[in-house]
Structures are given as C-alpha cells and as structure tokens.
Swiss-Prot record, chain B:
It comes from Prochlorococcus marinus (strain MIT 9301). The record marks 61 as: Reversibly protonated during proton transport. The lineage of its organism: Bacteria, Bacillati, Cyanobacteriota, Cyanophyceae, Synechococcales. InterPro entries: ATP_synth_csu_bac/chlpt, ATP_synth_F0_csu, ATP_synth_F0_csu_DDCD_BS, ATP_synth_F0_csu_sf, ATPase_proteolipid_c-like_dom, F/V-ATP_Csub_sf. PROSITE patterns: ATPASE_C. One of its GO terms (molecular function) is lipid binding. It is found in: Cellular thylakoid membrane. F-type ATPases have 2 components, F(1) - the catalytic core - and F(0) - the membrane proton channel. F(1) has five subunits: alpha(3), beta(3), gamma(1), delta(1), epsilon(1). F(0) has four main subunits: a(1), b(1), b'(1) and c(10-14). The alpha and beta chains form an alternating ring which encloses part of the gamma chain. F(1) is attached to F(0) by a central stalk formed by the gamma and epsilon chains, while a peripheral stalk is formed by the delta, b and b' chains. This is ATP synthase subunit c. The chain crosses the membrane at residues 7-27, 57-77. Pfam families: ATP-synt_C. GO terms for cellular component: plasma membrane-derived thylakoid membrane; proton-transporting ATP synthase complex; proton-transporting two-sector ATPase complex, proton-transporting domain.
Amino acid sequence: MLPNFAALEVGQHLYWQIGNIRLHGQVFLTSWILLGALLVFISLGTKKMENDPKGLQNLLEFLWDYIRDLARTQIGEKVYRDWMPFIGTLFLFVFVSNWGGALIPWRLIKLPSGELGAPTADINTTIALALLVSLSYFYAGLSNKGWRYFEYYVHPTPIMLPFKILEDFTKPLSLSFRLFGNILADELVVGVLVFLVPLILPIPVMFLGLFTSAIQALIFATLAAYYIGEAVEEHH
Amino acid sequence: MDSITSAASVVAAGLAVGLGAIGPGLGQGNAAQGAVEGIARQPEAEGKIRGTLLLSFAFMESLTIYGLVVALVLLFANPFS
C-alpha cells in the first residue's frame, strides 16, 4: 500500500504544555526547520560575494531586486528603504512556509497526534503575522508624520471616520484569513484527492497548489507594503 | 454533538462555500473578459495585464476562501457542539 502522504487532520494538534499555555507543537517544529533552512540558504549565498554573481548569489540578488521593486512601488521612493527588510522577511517566510509545507513529505514522520505541514496552515501563525503588519503600519504612520497621521482618518470628509476605524480591524482579519484559508484549502483539496484517487490525478492539483501558494505569499507582502504605504503617504 | 446540530452545520458549511462562490465566480469572469479584451487590443501589454489579473484573481478568490473558513470552522471546530 502507498504511504499516506496527506490526511484530513484539521482539528488535531501536537500539544505542548508550557505553564498555562497550550502550544501547537507541530507548527513550531516545521517553522523552526524551515527558518533554519532559509538561514543556511541565505548565509551560503552571501558568504563569498563576487562582483559578477553566480549560482546562489545570483538567485538571491534576483530576489532582492524583486522585493525592492515591490516595496518601492507600494511604499514610495521616500521611505521604502526602511521597510524593505520587513517586507522581504514577510515574503520569504510566507513563501518558504507555503512551499515547504507542500513540497516536503512531512507525512512520513509520524507524530503522536496531528501532522506536520505548512506553518501558515495554522490560524495562529497567520494572525501573528497580520498583527505584526498592523503594528508596523501604525508605527510607520506615527513615526513619519507624528500626530498628523490621524488626519488620515478624516481625510476626505469626517463621515469616513467610523469606516476608517473599522478598516483597522478588518485589515488584519482579512489578511490572516486569506492566507490561512488558501493554504489550508490547498492541503485539504490535495488530501481529499489523494484519499479518492491515490495515483497521478492529484499531481496537477498539487501544481495548482504550489502556484496559489506563491501568489498568496506575493499578495501578503504586497498588501503589507500597501498598508504601510497608505500610512506614510502625504495628503495635500 | 446532537444530530440536529451536526445536520445544520453540514448544510450551513455547504451553503457557505456554495453561495460564497457565486459572486467571485462572476467577478473573475468579468475580470478575465476585460483582460482578454485588453490583450487583444494591445498584445504587447500582455505581461503587465497577466500580473494584475492574477493578483486581482487572488483577491476575489479570498472572498470564497472566507466562506470556506466558516465552513471549516463549522465542520472541524464547531462552537455549538
């Protein structure tokens, strides 16, 4: 019998009890592994830097260019350099966790309960990332414009005030639910298909999943940059 | 979970995704139509149009995904059980 590469274990987790807090252990394990891989990858690529880049350094420079263009178009020429590391970190972490969850056969490692998978398929990870984005756009607005940041809330007319305040809550909500739902939906669709037809048929769906995972990482980074850009933008 | 709650949850989960897919489906159709017309009129802008189209597709898709999240909560983490 083929090994079961995916299963439907949505509500089950590997719990770690620390004091009064129950942690979802499998998320920590996978995100530590993926962060370690990312660190190794980047430190290897930047260890011996050459004037005309080859191999890994070339790839990393391409990534750097890509993230810089993203940040510059969304945040604007003036302050994008301050926020590029943050946007780049978000993009790389989300991208590596989405693809790592899909490409590495975690299922071969047996856990007492729950299963290893993409860290972003757990709502706690995505909510933490989305709240980080919220905090940073407030910080960006306040540090760049001081108290004038709050002009943004009454900018065209004061009638907009309740909607703008509501927006501060819906931004992290939609940001986290979008990423969580997409990644979990990918895993579920692949899981259901593997359960129904274990051979060949799930492969195109897996490719579609890889594609949407990459797009979701791009969207998360783009939206984070857009919110920060909105906060630092000057009104005239 | 009693049987009424589980039956209602399953029906609600189906409706959440099914109804939630209508709007984004129409929207994606409209967006694709616009993109195809744009490419037909100006084939050299294809790359830019494709990028924007994919990004806006993902935004529309996320609306259905919200429905899916509600369905998943009802099926796997039901608060009423």
